[in-house]
Amino acid sequence: ITESEYEILSNDGYRFDDLIGRTGIEYAYEDILRGSWGGEMIEVDAVGNFQRSLGVKPSQKGDDIQLTIDLDIQKVAEEVLEDKIGGAIIVMDPRDGAILAIASKPTFDLNFFSRDFKPEEEYNDLFFSDSKPLFNRALNAYDPGSVWKIVTALAGLESGQFPANTLLETSPCIIYGSQCFREHNDLGFGIIGYEDALRVSSNTFFYQVGYGVGVDKIYEISQILGFSQLSGIEISDQEDVGLIANSDWAQSGRGWGNPGETPWLPEDIASMSIGQFVVQVTPIQIAKAYAVIANGGYVVTP
């Protein structure tokens, strides 16, 4: 506890040299885990010699909590990331949202904050490194890319414009606005439906679906799935809500321009349809959305 923290926390029974949870589960459940100090009040004479005990208050240990983490799965997740520059892995039970593993790379020694002495080099590496090891990448927002296509697919299905038996012609390129939006294999996949489009991750199939239903339908479905909002995970103090664009967002200035001067463009919907540019989501949000597909249609809280 720092000096400034002590001024506030001392009212709750903390001492100046106490250790407290700084991040993650230990931060979220600090009140449950911490317990309370005990002590003995004694009477002494003028020179400090013990005379008698006036009372004893026993200390109380904090309560235990049981995590849903599966240690074996957690170890595998961390091993997979070990030789990677950066990334995140989340393993979630789609039936109830239980987190079985969550890993982020780069990471740091969680015992660092409890040390009395913190070497300057280690401190600088932790707080000022370009790799940002303090960021939990499982809870930070990024362009999702092709994993977003399932959202566009649901928007097409729910709109009624692109029912389950829809077949669309894919091609090397489709022009929206002034830009050619390419298929990732530069050839196309012929006439395909949803299942094959997801299997081969066709860009031009989902360009057509997204452009057909429009940005606001994709946005509507994304909100049902839990995007652009906190996932509900207990360690949400570290969580980014991300960004899912819609027509109101574009009309209001996109967060950087003047209202009315940043209209929605055809290029925007093409990019949005495959999870690029105007879509930023977190890995935990993606896991939550895919759980809906896996469990038959209901939203769970991680």
Locations of regions flagged by a protein language model:
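Extracytoplasmic/periplasmic proteins that interact with beta-lactams or build/remodel peptidoglycan
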Residues: 1-88, 103, 108-137, 141
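Beta-lactam-recognizing serine transpeptidase/beta-lactamase-like catalytic domain environment
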Residues: 45-53, 95-146, 151-302
